[in-house]
Amino acid sequence: MRIMLDTNVLISALLFPGVKMNAMMNYIFTHHQLVLSSYVVDELKSVVKRKFPGREIAINKLLMMMSFEYVYTPSEIESGLFDIRDVKDYPVLYTAIIEDVDILVTGDKDFSDIDIEKPEIMSPTQFMERFL
């Protein structure tokens, strides 16, 4: 399966790794294809620079060491495919849809009430309960 991570999950995995998060990441790396979008990677770098100054180099090194498929979020995004409370989250799900991602893992509650077939939207806890 192709699994995309949202920014908040990436931050947790890269800056605050724990036993469960490491297990989830290892499972994804060994059994599935990790997909990261340009929007999420850019947002990750921006958040780290703003909230965790001095960690940018570490994040860049970790990203370079990770195995993932990098997909581009289009600069022009078709609106109206789904409703989401926070418009800043629209490009994340839009990219997951157009790139045919199977699962989007996010800790963002704004995704929880979206009713779409694919990708399946799961929290890290839901993902771990199902697959680990």
Where on the chain are the PLM-derived regions?
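Alpha-helix capping/helix-boundary segments
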Residues: 9-10, 40, 92, 110-111, ...
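Conserved beta-strand segments of alpha/beta enzyme cores
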Residues: 33, 69-70, 120
